[in-house]
């Protein structure tokens, strides 16, 4: 794709460099009290996107065509649709923010169509094997068995398990808070 020259749109009220736009957006996310992990996700998406923009220095230079060029390059580089959709979700929030602040022209951003993948469920034998108590005194095997049973029983994510503390467990009522 060729180099684009920017023509300032008179309807846009502010012209900000990408780095400054990113800072304003991330501060807005902090003011909204978004989780640090969400803010990190947005920051990583923006930095990845900005690194792949050729000659684009200002937010008002980001157009649907620029975004689609980015996606085509990613597809040609072998990126999976699921990964691209994850990026699109973060960038869509940024684009909407920029359009609301009149830093750039609004444009619709839709997720890419993914082929349905059918994951094979575990067989009854595999589930029984996963839930079977270890036949050893090795601590690691007991830990792994406990974690698998915890995941199966609660459906919690790994990040929840990592942050779980003894004070979060009511052993008498057998409840986790």
Model-derived regions, located:
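Conserved catalytic core of the tyrosine transesterase superfamily
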Residues: 1-177
């Amino acid at each position: 794709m060729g180099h684009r020259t920017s023509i300032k749109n008179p309807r846009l009220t502010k012209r900000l460099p990408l780095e400054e736009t990113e800072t304003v957006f991330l501060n807005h996310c902090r003011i909204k009290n978004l989780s640090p992990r969400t803010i990190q996700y947005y920051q990583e998406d923006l930095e990845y996107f900005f690194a792949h923009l050729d000659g684009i220095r200002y937010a008002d230079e980001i157009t649907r065509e620029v975004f689609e060029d980015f996606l085509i390059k990613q597809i040609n580089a072998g990126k999976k649709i699921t990964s691209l959709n994850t990026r699109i979700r973060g960038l869509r929030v940024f684009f909407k923010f920029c359009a609301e602040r009149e830093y750039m022209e609004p444009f619709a951003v839709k997720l890419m169509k993914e082929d349905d993948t059918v994951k094979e469920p575990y067989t009854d034998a595999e589930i029984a094997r996963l839930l079977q108590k270890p036949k050893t005194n090795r601590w690691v095997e007991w830990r792994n068995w406990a974690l698998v049973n915890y995941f199966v029983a609660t459906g919690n994510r790994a990040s929840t398990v990592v942050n779980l503390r003894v004070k979060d467990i009511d052993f008498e009522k057998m409840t986790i808070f």
